[in-house]
Every structure is written in C-alpha cells, then in structure tokens.
Amino acid sequence: MRRTPVVASRALSERCGHDVWLKCENLQRTGSFKPRGAYVRIFGLSDSERANGVVAASAGNHAQGVAWSAATLGIASRVYMPTGASLPKIAATRAYGAEVVLEGETVDESLEAAARYAEESGAILIHPFDHPDIVAGQATVGIEILEQLPDVGTVLVPLGGGGLLAGVAAALKLHRPEVRVIGVQATSAAAWPDSLAAGKPVKARSMNTMADGISVALPGAVPFAHVQDLVDEVVTVSEESISQALLLVLERAKLVVEPAGATAVAALTSLPDLELDGQVCVVLSGGNIDPLLLTQVITHGLRASGRYLTITVTVPDRPGGLVALLELLRDLNVSVVDVIHSRVSGELSLGEVAVTVSLETKGPDHQTRVRSALARAGYSVA
C-alpha cells in the first residue's frame, strides 16, 4: 500500500483564500483509495474463510481494489461486473488477478449475482463500503493527512456509499476533534442530504451523474452512523462544476482524476459560502477514467467555463461562402477546432448550407461577442 502524497495547489489557494493541499489517492495502488479498505477486510479473514476465496461486485475501483488486495494476500478472488463495464476496467481487474464474471446490466444486479455465488460457494462477499473493516481501512487516509498536514483545519472528501468519509472523519475526529470535515456529493445523485434529514439511509431520488464512482443509491448503514455523528457538513455540486474541477486539476496540478475524484475540488470552486477553517485538504479519491470519457468530460468542462462553443450557422451555398465565415471568426480571435457542413437539413432553403463549427473561445463574454458579431453580419445562428 502506498502512502500517497499531499500536493500544494496554488491555483485553489488563490481562489479560496486558504492554503489548499491535494491528497492524491489517484496515485494509490490501482488508482484509487479502494485497496485500503479491501485489504483490511480481506486481511482479517480466518484461514478457513481465506480458503474459500472472496467475491465482490463493482464496475470499477472496488473491483480493482479487491483483486489487488486478494492477490497480494495470496487469496483467490472473483469479481462480478456489469455487462456494460468499460473494457479498460475489466482488463485492469483481470490483470490484478481476479476472475471476472460479466453478469447483470447494473452494479446492483452484479451484486445480486455475487451474493448468490457467495452463498453457494462459501466465498466471502467483500462489500464496497458497508462493513466496519472497510471503514477502518479507509481511515488510514485520515491518519496520513494528520501526519502530513499537522495543522490541517478542514478536510473535504468525496461521498458515495460513505466508507471513505466515515473512515476519514473517524480518524480526524479521534485525534483532532476541531478539524472540520465536509462530505461532497453530486447533486444529481445525492442520497445523503435526505438520509441525514431522515436520520436513516434513504434512497437517492435520481442517479444521473458523470461521477460514477460515487453514484450510490443507498448509503451504507455502517458508514451512516459515523457520518451522522462525526461529519460537520455534507454539500452537493453540479455536473458542470465537477467537469470544471476535473479540468482545473488536470491543467494546473497536472493530475488526472476521475469525476468522482474531482467532486471535493468542485465544492471549493463552486460554493463561495462554504465554511472553511485554516489549512484545507482536498481528497482526490481516484483517477481511473477511460480516455474517451476523459475527452468528453474535458469538453464538458471547457463548455461550462465558456472556453468551447459549438454553433450552427447558415451560409450561402456558393464559392467563398465558408471562407467569409471563417475570416470573420479569425477577426474575432477565435480558434476553429472543427467544421462540419450539411445540405440535407429540412430547414434549409435552396442555395443554403448549414455549417456547424466548434470553436475555442476565451470565456462567456467572448462567446457573447462572437454570437453578436455573427448576427450583425447577417448570419442565422443556432
């Protein structure tokens, strides 16, 4: 297991007026914090339990954490993954030593299959977050933060099922009760605000977020008790703020994180009223993101920050029609990323062509100027 570094972030420090440090769990074994809990859980098994092996269900990080931990301890592992799981994550899980079984369309269906296998075979089911040993393993993140940043005043942690937040909060509050601990969820998959208000785990109203690593419908009972007693605040962040945070970490800290790993950064950058005390530590919980998804999220972040604009312009279908448009965009100091034309739209008149251009812009104000200039030049813009 790696003792992951904490890295100072000048960009975030300047934004929020506090010294901000990044706890880089994206640099942990398998690319996320998950092996910490999985290793502790599997290490605690008896010899007879170890002989039957372990089983888990996951679409990504937990799968790899269990596979690596079991292999490190010399124990057989089987991991059930949804049939739609990404090929890189399937390949990584196998590479870490697990037998991978693709069953079910969702993680919940895969978990049902894993539970059936555990009952039939005697294998021990390793839950991703709802077990005391899992929480204890994740607590090592909090212990390291205290050792690396003795004066830390606020810690922000991504929040899904609750195992990571519960463990970090338990470690911090045991040694430094005054440290402020904040959990961060995606607004579009936020079970925790309703759960804390109800005093018990409650299912999320929706599950539609790019942050699949924290997309958990029902909080765990074990972590819920810790979060309820120890965590100072739980906040939620939008999809736009998550993609912008991922882009910021990539550009300024030179670190690759997955959307779930960027949620705590998103809280710093998008919630101006967030209460922070002293030195701030932000946990980057993971960095496992498919290259294609990374491209999509980067584009999403660029759009959200006004740095990427796609518009469709109607131009005359004659020689020089496209040139005139591109010259105008050049004069507006716009970089053209892509150009697509179509003559088959039912909304076009004879002698017209629709040109879809993707542009690199310098912010929302620049985009407004571009649209205004095109309109003044007589172009129909969509």
Regions found by a protein language model. Give the residues of each.
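PLP-dependent amino-acid enzyme catalytic core
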Residues: 1-382
